[in-house]
UniProtKB/Swiss-Prot annotation:
Gene Ontology BP terms: detection of chemical stimulus involved in sensory perception of bitter taste
Species name: Rattus norvegicus
PROSITE patterns listed in its UniProt record: G_PROTEIN_RECEP_F1_2 (PS50262)
Name recorded for this polypeptide: Taste receptor type 2 member 125
Gene: Tas2r125
Entry keywords, A to Z: G-protein coupled receptor, Glycoprotein, Membrane, Receptor, Sensory transduction, Taste, Transducer, Transmembrane, Transmembrane helix
């Protein structure tokens, strides 16, 4: 990677890090304040708040790992450092991904309209479905950490036996590609769940519109509007999720060293938790209204400061 591209990627990472933390911090703060005032919080606000906190954790852990490995590249070959950094990122990424997936499940079960008995049972127990989904995902998290640590130990043993297993060697590139393959494989599960929920929601909207046409009713009834609004939320999520998933998959097929393109791939990966959170604010009426109030307050403050300056 050229110096200019590296500087641009580093600048984008810093900007996304700031925007992502501000957006996610704003989401968490607004929902927590509303929770304290009302002394209750809805399921969707619980998911969004937990998602915002997990994304702050992911952004901070990713930024710190990149910063430490850039300033101290020799630590990349230290087994304990590799394990710690991998485990931290795996945990942060896991909760960020699975909470986002739980949000898509929520919209599907809450908005979609099917007469299937299983679907109705899941809708009636929506809170339990989300809780069980997150609990079952912990099994995948444990498996991901165990397999990754076994892979690191295998690489470490080979590194100790043979000096050619240096960090800049082809063997080390294979190590990172295999590690990436492991993480991408575990990311396939929530990605598939989200895609299924997305497709079923589209099918539900299509059936609903077909029924409206059959009964000679307009397509702008309340149920259709709710369907479309939920579908817009899920479409934005799926688009960014697909972008995130492809950014992981592309790294497996690149022929260049992962080290050379490290900043570029980090830029792609942190786009999802940063930009999608901004879209959540714009699409959520409560968060959008709170953000407009904050912007109005900042605008008034800036005008007051300008009038005080001679």
């Amino acid at each position: 990677m050229g110096i200019v591209i590296g500087i641009i990627c580093a600048f984008i990472i810093i900007v996304q890090f700031i925007i992502g933390n501000v957006a996610n911090g704003f989401i968490a703060l607004v929902n927590i304040i509303d929770w304290v005032k009302r002394r209750k919080i809805s399921l969707v606000d619980q998911i969004i708040t937990a998602l915002a906190i997990s994304r702050i954790d992911m952004l901070c852990s990713t930024f710190l790992i990149v910063l430490i490995t850039s300033l101290y590249p020799d630590l990349n070959t230290a087994v304990n450092m590799v394990k710690i950094s991998n485990n931290i990122w795996i945990v942060a990424n896991h909760f960020s991904i699975w909470l986002a997936t739980s949000l898509s499940i929520f919209y599907f079960l809450k908005i979609a309209n099917f007469s299937n008995y299983v679907f109705l049972c899941l809708r009636w127990r929506l809170s339990k479905v989300v809780s069980v989904t997150l609990l079952l995902s912990l099994v995948l998290l444990l498996m991901n950490i165990l397999i990754m640590n076994m892979h690191i130990d295998t690489w470490s043993d080979g590194f100790k036996r043979n000096v050619s297993f240096g960090f800049r060697s082809k063997n080390c590139t294979r190590f990172f590609k295999l590690a990436l393959l492991i993480n991408t494989t575990f990311t396939c599960v929530p990605f598939t769940v989200s895609m299924v929920a997305f497709l079923l929601l589209i099918f539900s909207l299509w059936r609903h519109l077909k029924n409206m046409q059959y009964h000679a009713k307009g397509s702008r009834d309340p149920s259709t509007a709710v369907h479309i609004k939920a579908l817009q939320m899920v479409v934005v999520f799926v688009l960014f999720y697909t972008f995130f998933f492809l950014s992981l998959a592309i790294q497996l097929w690149t022929s260049e060293s992962l080290e050379k393109n490290n900043l570029f791939y980090v830029t792609l990966i942190i786009t999802f938790p940063s930009v999608h959170s901004c879209m959540l604010i714009l699409r959520n009426s409560k968060l959008r209204q709170a953000s407009l109030l904050v912007l109005w307050w900042l605008l008034c403050r800036s005008k007051d400061i300008q009038t005080l300056v001679p």
